[in-house]
Amino acid sequence: MNAYEWIQSVVLFAVLLLAIKPMGSFMAKIFQGDRTFLSRLLVPCESFIYRVCGIDKDEEMGWQQYAWALLLFNLICGVALFFILLLQGVLPLNPQKFPAFSWHLALNTAVSFMTNTNWQNYGGESTASYFTQTFGFAVHNFLSAATGIVVAIATIRGFVRRRVSKIGNFYVDIARCTLYLLLPVSLVFAVFLVSQGVIQNFSGYRTVPLVQATSYLKPKLDATGNALKDPKGNSITETIQVKEVTIPMGPVASQEAIKELGTNGGGFFNANSAHPYENPTPLANVVEVFLMLLIGGSLTYTFGVMAGNTRQGWAILAVMLAILVTAVGTLYWAETSGNPLVAKLGVHGVNMEGKETRFGVAGTSLFTSAATGTSCGAVNAMHDSMTPIGGMIPLSLILLSEVVVGGVGTGLYTMIAFVVISVFIAGLMIGRTPELLGKKIEVREMWMSIITVLTSGILVLIFSGLALVVPSAVSSMANPGAHGLSEVLYAFASMSNNNGSAFAGLNGNTIFYNVTGAIAMFLGRFAPIVASLAMAGSLAQKKFIPASLGTLPTDKIPFALWLTLVILIVGALTFFPALSLGPIVEHLIMLGGK
């Protein structure tokens, strides 16, 4: 790295660490019902919402009631978005006259935004109207993020509370999360992004002539959207000449802020955060990385504050950041090492294919690692154009169940599941009943943790295997061999883990991928949520056990190292065979010069 790249990285993580404590403390106040500096302004709004919706803010729920309320709320929101997409053609704020989504694309997209995945089998600027973007996607960016956060808070309450059956009120939690946390922070950073050049308007698209006409080759597609191929298996192309270009407009800044803050990731434009209207400057790029990591990282401190042991929160954060920094460094090394196949053609240097020159390799490595370590899934470069090892880094971060730092809320409750598993295994090794924060870890907690951790892995392997044998799914693959396998594996890893990023080269807008993807996203989101809430309900009913000489300290460096090892071992045992057939084989082929 040069001096600028070092400064960029160091300043980012330094500012993040400085923000963890105040933001974590602020969130603890929000969810403990304490007054904050926003209370004077927002309490009337909060009370109005409760009054209109008939919510008793003092009535709490058991874990089953909390889970049912969460599922019902999200299903209603998802169905509403589904019909917005089906009726897009007749709804207002559609200056480009975009037609309705097909039923299977509407299903996939509605589930995608409902589950905080933001997987997009469409191009935003060529498919979605301003009404859809604003009242459909942007609204769900807030609500899906809030859903993940409140599940993490409910899980924390399971450790904090003693001999009770209640873990909070879902409706109160999601209202306070949206009002006091997501809306104010998004507003501040939306204004900042506008200052950097991100657009915010409802104007129609603008068509302007090019100074010089250009042409490019475009693959021909059949009626189903799949690439046509000649008898030798090569794609059939046609030459397209371009004399003018249409510049899309739209309310981008307001959606961009919550897209990163809520680790949603769905781009207003097809190019996502590589587009200059979403991410125009290197400073905006670093700030967007900061937003991705802010809430997920700060929730670890919230955990420590609410549990009465802030060192526990710092220990979990240290594990998250250690893996993240390692991923950033490995990705940077892989991309700066270049491609030996290209070097043979006389093109030496770093691999800049698919990257924006305003960000460079360092800015791309930071953004890519943060977006896949969290559940954000935003991209500022083409992941498919990275070297095999470079592409394996974001894939591996997703496959680790996104605990680095993880999505807002999802990262923490998944990491807590890993902590429970680590404590349980360590307890078996030393012959002690496992304990965590004064609560016994027994069979029920272990089962719920296993469901939380392994659900996504099971979905990835089942659906990836299915996609490699179903003819209609195989026809969606534009690349054969190891790279084609990597693309399929990445797609279902991204959907099952609610990430949303993708490798190119795979036509996902088919009935097979839209329907199976919707199933993977739904189960990958809500099975771990229900399991985490069930664990919280079980823990809340247990008595507190004071620490003794035989208690395993979980806030010290040895346990942090043990937790890191468990996370990596679970990921390796689950996915190493698949990675061996995909990016690892592809890397060996590249080194072999083939």
Swiss-Prot record:
Keyword Cell membrane applies: yes
Annotated membrane topology: Multi-pass membrane protein
InterPro entries: KdpA
Cross-referenced Pfam families: KdpA
Primary localisation category: membrane
Keyword presence, Chaperone: no
Compartments in which it is found: Cell inner membrane
Recorded GO CC terms: plasma membrane
Keywords: Cell inner membrane, Cell membrane, Ion transport, Membrane, Potassium, Potassium transport, Transmembrane, Transmembrane helix, Transport
A GO MF term: potassium ion binding
Membrane spanning residue stretches: 11-31, 67-87, 136-156, 179-199, 286-306, 314-334, 411-431, 450-470, 517-537, 559-579
Similarity field: Belongs to the KdpA family.
Protein role: Part of the high-affinity ATP-driven potassium transport (or Kdp) system, which catalyzes the hydrolysis of ATP coupled with the electrogenic transport of potassium into the cytoplasm. This subunit binds the periplasmic potassium ions and delivers the ions to the membrane domain of KdpB through an intramembrane tunnel.
Complexes and interactors: The system is composed of three essential subunits: KdpA, KdpB and KdpC.
Protein name: Potassium-transporting ATPase potassium-binding subunit
Organism: Citrifermentans bemidjiense (strain ATCC BAA-1014 / DSM 16622 / JCM 12645 / Bem)
